[in-house]
Curated annotation (Swiss-Prot):
Record-annotated Phosphagen kinase C-terminal domain positions: 113-349
Gene Ontology terms: cellular component: extracellular space
Residue span, Phosphagen kinase N-terminal domain: 3-85
Lineage top rank: taxon: Eukaryota
Protein name as it appears in the record: Arginine kinase
Residues the record lists as binding ATP: 116-120, 179, 223, 274-278, 302-307
Membrane-crossing segments per the record: none
Length: 349
């Protein structure tokens, strides 16, 4: 309790924090939740630790485990509504659309604008906690279960699993050059126990073509990524959905009817789907109203090296903004229409 009282003191006494934690963890909510515990052993302290230690956080709240979304709903509910800009905690059933009739293919057959296309989702095991409530043995066990499912993949998805622990320098160098490797450098995740027991239990799986990639125990239990050079969104999306469906046969993923798929950070909930292109748009990006254009199309633009980075040579990472309150196929269609509009504007500029 001393730990929690200290964290609460940090958050409540800070006048400058703009985080959603600061905004929604009122004295009343704190008093109501401070003694509660999830079946995974998760506490309010686990949920707010990162935001209290990093008062410049945007969100500042992580879920201690899948059950935290129910037990600590008085804090997490308002944070979710606020972050996702929705009016009620409601999410449709999972719907990937009719894969044989998507109505779209390659955005950019000429190859003039789109450098690469990528779609990812996050998934959590229903029976394991999130980083704050896991111990070393559980991390190892979760990796074992996930690795078993991944190594059973066949056809185009067939590949190899590389644990981070004991990885040779050669493999490490190759994966870093491929931009496949994740590291332990995010201070927000670190404060949220995201890197406890690092690198135990973490690893990377990818297929022979390096177009299907799975991160194990990075931020989320599982991040499934499909990607390739060029603009063939349909091929990338179908591969991703195929991979998800195969893994679902062997693993049970955490989901709530009103929130969709559960993730460690409430910002990824819902479809958890982020569809993005690296796209050359030097002219549109120079327009003073560029951000406004993206907002109107429900797109997010950032530099190609991830969040908070600048563009290199007019190449931007453009992705769908909305994760909650719409289905997977709706999220993909929204991104497709938005990117088509951006290409049209670039051509006309």
């Amino acid at each position: 309790m001393a730990d929690l009282a200290e964290l609460w003191e940090k958050v409540s006494s800070n006048k400058d924090s703009k985080s959603l934690l600061k905004k929604h963890l009122t004295k009343e909510v704190y008093e109501k939740l401070k003694d509660k515990k999830t079946k995974f052993g998760g506490t309010l302290a686990d949920c707010i630790r990162s935001g209290a230690k990093n008062l410049d956080s945007g969100v500042g709240v992580y879920a201690s485990d899948p059950e935290a979304y129910t037990v600590f709903q008085d804090l997490l509910g308002p944070v979710i509504l606020d972050y996702h800009k929705i009016t009620e905690l409601k999410h449709p059933a999972c719907d990937f659309g009719d894969l044989s009739n998507l109505g779209f293919g390659d955005f950019d057959p000429s190859g003039d604008w789109i450098v690469s296309t990528r779609v990812r989702v996050g998934r959590s095991h229903a029976s394991f906690g999130f980083p704050p409530t896991l111990n070393k043995e559980q991390r190892v066990e979760m990796q074992r279960v996930t690795q078993g499912a991944l190594e059973g993949l066949t056809g185009e998805l067939k590949g190899k699993y590389y644990p981070l622990e004991g990885m040779t320098p050669d493999v490490q160098k190759q994966l870093t050059e491929d931009h496949f490797l994740f590291n332990d450098s995010d201070r927000f995740l670190k404060a949220a126990s995201g890197y406890d027991d690092w690198p135990t239990g973490r690893g990377i799986f990818f297929n022979d073509n390096k177009t299907f990639l799975v991160w194990v125990n990075e931020e989320d239990h599982i991040r499934i990524i499909s990607m390739q050079k060029g603009g063939d969104l349909a091929a990338v999306y179908k591969r991703l959905v195929g991979g998800i469906k195969e893994l679902e046969k062997k693993l049970e993923f955490a989901r709530l009817p009103n929130l969709g798929y559960l993730t460690f950070c409430p910002s990824n909930l819902g479809t958890t789907l982020r569809a993005s292109v690296h796209i050359k748009i030097p002219k549109v990006a120079k327009k003073p109203e560029f951000k406004e254009i993206c907002d109107k199309l429900n797109l997010q633009a950032r530099g190609i090296h991830g969040e908070h980075t600048e563009s290199v040579g007019g190449v931007y990472d453009i992705s769908n903004k909305r994760r909650m309150g719409l289905s997977e196929i709706e999220a993909i269609q929204e991104m497709r229409k938005g990117v088509e509009e951006i290409i049209k504007l670039e051509k006309a500029a």
